[in-house]
Structures are given as C-alpha cells and as structure tokens.
C-alpha cells in the first residue's frame, strides 16, 4: 500500500517536474497539451477529462477525482493504478519525491 501523502517541498517538486514531467506535460492555465495533458486544474478534476486531450478508454473509465493522495498512488506506478494508460512514465518510487512533486503541482496548477 502506498504511503500517505504529506506536504513536501514545492521547490524540490518544481525541480522534479522539470526533470521528470516537463517533456510531456505543461501546468499553466491555457498551456498546450503535449504527449501528456496540460495539468492545470488537475486536483479536483476527474481522470481522463482534460478538455481537448485524447485519453485512452482506461483513463476515461477510471473515473477517479484527482486528490493529493490518489495522485501519489498513481505516480508511484501509473500502469498499475490505471492499466491501459498511455503514460509511459515508470513512476516515482520514493514517497518523498511524490510528496514534493504533488506539493508543487497543487500550487502550480491552481
């Protein structure tokens, strides 16, 4: 079972985003979709629902409302959390890294 989410370092999370996520995602409002969807407003949004992005049926059918905790669960192993997702990222195994990244995303995607 994944570790419970705890607020992390937004600064470290920003660096993780730049090195692990930026090649496929944007965070700013109105930002373009890339290989992955724009993440603006991700917390509170239902999986597979970013306007204009072509999701797999698996993402659409998962029907999870993204929270800090289930983002942490997902980011530990995306293909295990949503079998059939096209997200190629293998995951962040360290809870601290997930906490830092999610703390950054919460702020950067509002």
From Swiss-Prot:
PROSITE patterns: CYTC (PS51007). The keyword Heme applies. GO terms for cellular component: mitochondrial intermembrane space. Heme c binds at residues 21, 24-25, 87. The keyword Metal-binding applies. Binds 1 heme c group covalently per subunit. It comes from the Eukaryota. InterPro entries: Cyt_c-like_dom, Cyt_c-like_dom_sf, Cyt_c_1A/1B. The modification N6,N6,N6-trimethyllysine is found at residue 79. GO terms for molecular function: electron transfer activity; heme binding; metal ion binding. Pfam families: Cytochrom_C. Keywords: Electron transport, Heme, Iron, Metal-binding, Methylation, Mitochondrion, Respiratory chain, Transport. SUPFAM superfamilies: Cytochrome c (SSF46626). It is found in: Mitochondrion intermembrane space. Belongs to the cytochrome c family. Electron carrier protein. The oxidized form of the cytochrome c heme group can accept an electron from the heme group of the cytochrome c1 subunit of cytochrome reductase. Cytochrome c then transfers this electron to the cytochrome oxidase complex, the final protein carrier in the mitochondrial electron-transport chain. This is Cytochrome c. It comes from Debaryomyces hansenii (strain ATCC 36239 / CBS 767 / BCRC 21394 / JCM 1990 / NBRC 0083 / IGC 2968). The gene is CYC1.
């Amino acid at each position: 079972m994944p570790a419970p989410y705890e607020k992390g370092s937004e600064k470290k999370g920003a660096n993780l985003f730049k090195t692990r996520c930026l090649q496929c995602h944007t965070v700013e409002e109105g930002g373009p979709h890339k290989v992955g969807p724009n993440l603006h407003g991700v917390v509170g949004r239902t999986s597979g629902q970013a306007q204009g992005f072509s999701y797999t049926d698996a993402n659409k059918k998962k029907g999870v409302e993204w929270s800090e905790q289930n983002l942490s669960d997902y980011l530990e192993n995306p293909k295990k959390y949503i079998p059939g997702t096209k997200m190629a990222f293998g995951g962040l195994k360290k809870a601290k890294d997930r906490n830092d990244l999610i703390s950054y995303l919460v702020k950067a995607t509002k």
